Amino acid sequence: MGTPASVVSEPPLWQVSTPQTRGRKQASANIFQDAELVQIQGLFQRSGDQLAEERAQIIWECAGDHRVAEALRRLRRKRPPKQNHCSRLRVPEPGSTASDPQASTTDTASSEQSGNSRRTSARAPRNWNKPGPTGYLHQIRH
C-alpha cells in the first residue's frame, strides 16, 4: 500500500512560499560571512568588548567556517574575571592619603573584616520566638 495522495501532493507549510516570503533574503548560518573586518571590529567596539580587535580578527578569518563558535569560546575563556564586585570596591576616606602603602593595607584589612562581619550578620538565623511582626507572622503561617 502507498501513501495517501494528500500527503504526497502538498508540500509542508514551512516550504510554502507566500508573496511576502519570496522577496526576503535567505537566512545565513554565519551572519559575519560577507562583512568586512572593519565592520566587525566596529560592532564589537560599540558593544563595549575589551577584546574587540582580537575577536573580530578571528571571526573574519573563520568566516563561513564551522570553527567560528569554537574561536569565540576560546576568547571567552581568556577573559579575566570581573573585578567590580561590591566587596572588592574600596572608596578612599576623605582624610586618608593613598601615598602611604602601610596605611592603605591597614584600611583594606579593616574594611575586609567589617565586610565579613556584615555578611555573617546578614546570614544569622532569626529567632522567630521573639515578639514582633516577623515572629507573629511566622507563628500564624506555621
Swiss-Prot record:
Keywords: Cell cycle. The keyword Cell cycle applies. Signal peptide: none annotated. Residues 74-88 have a biased composition (Basic residues). May be involved in MAP kinase activation, epithelial sodium channel (ENaC) down-regulation and cell cycling. The keyword Disulfide bond does not apply. It comes from Mus musculus (Mouse). Residues 1-28, 74-142 are annotated as: Disordered. Residues 15-28, 96-119 have a biased composition (Polar residues). This is Arginine vasopressin-induced protein 1. Induction: By vasopressin. One of its GO terms (biological process) is positive regulation of MAPK cascade. It holds the Pfam family TC1. InterPro entries: AVPI1 (IPR039579), Avpi1/C8orf4_dom (IPR020282).
